[in-house]
Amino acid sequence: MKKKLYEGSSKILYSAEEDFLLIMAFSDKAVLETGETVDISGKGVLNNNISSFLMDKLEMIGIENHLIEKINMREQLIQYVEVFPIQVIISSVACGRFVKEFGMDEGYVFDKPIIDFKVRSREFNYPIVNEYQISNFGWLTMDEIRIVKAQTLRIYDFLSGLFIGIGIRLVECKLEFGRVFNGEESIIMLTDEISPDNCRLWHINSNEKLGFELIQNEPNKAFESYQLIANRLKEK
């Protein structure tokens, strides 16, 4: 019987039969900015499909990630990764904090994508942290930071093109990375998920918000939005 190891806001981790492997289950839960938890029936199934599809695509272009295989409607078999205590957020359009903190017009397109690092801590409200702090805190070496930034740009470039092909703009994406050890050596590996839960996705023509942003404002329409994204990706 699998043992529950961790339960987050939208995913649950279980033990697997083999060492250094885990089972990751996608739930229907979503935590709003107010802290309220809501259930969007069927969201977990769609996120499992979307994330496994996108991780497979990234593997094909040489981005190593934790996905081994999708094992059922809600669960994936994944590689154990020692996850870094940071999130990597890459944005190509003014949204979220750029509007709130800098007073920018939502939708303003940056000349180049902007990469931010945030501490993975809900308790401290995910504070921004810079490269020198990350290095001095001993979380990543400067060389690891360089690799993470390069991979983030490559992932974003690839996913942006893929989403444009289905009429959706990838405005912002939140990624997580970690280390996988092989003896004394380690490699950087993409982990967590890539889904409408951690990507800002807008209709390319109307800028209508899709995915998690819709849950925040119009939760009754959220499932249809996730379904739209999954269906369009299925056609690729």
UniProtKB/Swiss-Prot annotation:
The protein's enzyme class: ligase
GO molecular function, one term: phosphoribosylaminoimidazolesuccinocarboxamide synthase activity
Domain of life: Bacteria
Pathway as given in its UniProt record: Purine metabolism; IMP biosynthesis via de novo pathway; 5-amino-1-(5-phospho-D-ribosyl)imidazole-4-carboxamide from 5-amino-1-(5-phospho-D-ribosyl)imidazole-4-carboxylate: step 1/2
One Pfam family cited in the UniProt record for this chain: SAICAR_synt
EC number, UniProt record: 6.3.2.6
Catalytic reactions on record: 5-amino-1-(5-phospho-D-ribosyl)imidazole-4-carboxylate + L-aspartate + ATP = (2S)-2-[5-amino-1-(5-phospho-beta-D-ribosyl)imidazole-4-carboxamido]succinate + ADP + phosphate + 2 H(+)
Any one biological process term the GO annotation gives: cobalamin biosynthetic process
Keywords associated with the record: ATP-binding, Ligase, Nucleotide-binding, Purine biosynthesis
One Gene Ontology term, aspect cellular component: cytosol
Family classification: Belongs to the SAICAR synthetase family.
UniProt-listed PANTHER family: MULTIFUNCTIONAL PROTEIN ADE2, SI:DKEY-6E2.2
Protein name: Phosphoribosylaminoimidazole-succinocarboxamide synthase
